[in-house]
Amino acid sequence: MPANIKIALDCRDINIATTGTHTYLSELITAFNKQHNNQVSFVFIKPFIGVMPGNNAFAKLIRHFQFIFYKQITVPVLTLINGASVLICTDYVAPVFTPGFKSIVVFHDAFFWEYPLHYSALWLRMFKAAALAGAKKSIAVIAPSEYAKKQIALHTGINPDHIKVVYEAPKTFAPIKSQTNPQSLAQISAPYFLHVGTLAKHKNLPLLIEAFSKLDKHFKLVLVGGAPSSVHNNDVPNIMAAIQKHYLQNQVILTGYLSNADVANWYANAIGYVFPSYNEGFGLPVLEAMRYKLPIIAANNSCLPEIAQAGALYFDPSNANQLAVQMQAIVNNTPAIIASLNAQPAVLQQFSWDKVAASFVAIALDGLKNASKHA
């Protein structure tokens, strides 16, 4: 094993993704830049050209080809040219051919296997084949929680011993210097509950709207985020139907995708954060909400109790009445809410992007050491 290890990071999603994987990459790049030393250095790999625009069948076909070519040809070549010993891919897919280097691949969850109807069948078949082939060649598959590790192993057949848990951390928001966002100023005159995330089916937002309808009418509900890229996973029609069913057109605010500064503005002024998802791989917004000292109500399933711990109150995500009771607890500032807020600083201390970066480096070095033993 060489004295100086160079680690390559595939940064394709930094210019393509708009939500979770973009945040993951940007925070990891920042953290890796702090890790440079005499033993470890980093190189950041990006595509030479952008993706094919358009939503017609031809454009989608070209994008599929671009993705395969980039992952299986461009990335290995750039990794070799840059002299990296390890390549990290944070978007499920690592190259199958890794001459002269080892790979680490991140699986954020097992949704592609758990919810196949939420994706295009042809694209999903190609994507899963590429993901599993790359994972098989990797020195480790990274999962963001113990729950995600269990689900990935269950649904993909990857050996659990090959899956390493590396917890994520909250997004770094710039300090809010002033409350000058026109949209926010126009819409936050009433106290509001907040949810941040894509308007996807597993987010369970119609149930949140139903629960919200049971509260006093002077509150508002703000849903920050846009529709997911997959039309098969788009829950906007059901969300709009729930809003109309409960006559909440003037109380539920859908902001669409926002800049980090605007998202921070919504966090800073909310009275509470609600996370009703059926399933999450990590549940990053609960930590973001803790950064803003918000009381949190989260579903009692998947990874959410593992991540939020005592820093949130929980409910059955199939029970709107139970959720409404917990939201009312925020309004009443009950002892349980106060206790959860007091627990949040200790929870937050467990998660940082510096720890994430250090874990990746340790896994890379350990993988190289084990590979040299078996060479």
Features from the language model and the residues they span:
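Carbohydrate transferase catalytic cores enriched for Leloir-type hexosyltransferases
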Residues: 1-375
